[in-house]
């Protein structure tokens, strides 16, 4: 075989091997939507509202991008969840929540008839970072003590 044919063979082989390896890196087994990565639910216990965010095992939420407001002011709440400090490609060193985070809002009666705004942002395995996600929590009136979760 001539030297030129060998070089061409090597180049073509390298191209196919490389393209196969790259396709596995770029195309992960499963890209999840934000709704698949983060499932929000509400639970009222007496005068307390618990906002649960179930986080897919491959996803996480940034602590500094998690908030609850009444539209104007930040609402203070307790938080329950597994957190850790990571370094990722999007925000560098950050405190994140994994698996499940629960926002505990005491004295929920003072918010009757109001709409609260839950906002959060997270990523999927350092592959994609979701844009900020916001959900309205509509607190029922005095005679209608229901809670509704609405996507924005």
Positions of predicted regions on the chain:
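Extracellular/lumen-exposed scaffold segments
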Residues: 2-3, 7-8, 19-152
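Hydrophobic core
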Residues: 14-17
């Amino acid at each position: 075989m001539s030297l030129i044919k060998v070089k061409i063979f090597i180049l073509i082989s390298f191209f196919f091997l490389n393209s196969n390896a790259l396709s596995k890196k770029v195309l992960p087994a499963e890209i999840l939507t934000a709704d698949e990565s983060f499932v929000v639910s509400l639970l009222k216990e007496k005068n307390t509202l618990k906002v649960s965010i179930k986080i897919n095992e491959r996803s996480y939420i940034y602590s500094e991008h998690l908030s609850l407001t009444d539209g104007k002011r930040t609402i203070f709440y307790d938080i329950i969840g597994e957190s850790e400090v990571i370094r990722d490609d999007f925000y560098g060193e950050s405190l994140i929540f994994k698996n499940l985070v629960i926002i505990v809002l005491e004295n929920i009666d003072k918010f009757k008839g109001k709409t609260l705004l839950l906002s959060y942002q997270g990523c999927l395995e350092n592959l994609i970072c979701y844009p900020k996600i916001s959900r309205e929590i509509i607190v029922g009136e005095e005679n209608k003590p229901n809670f509704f979760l609405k996507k924005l």
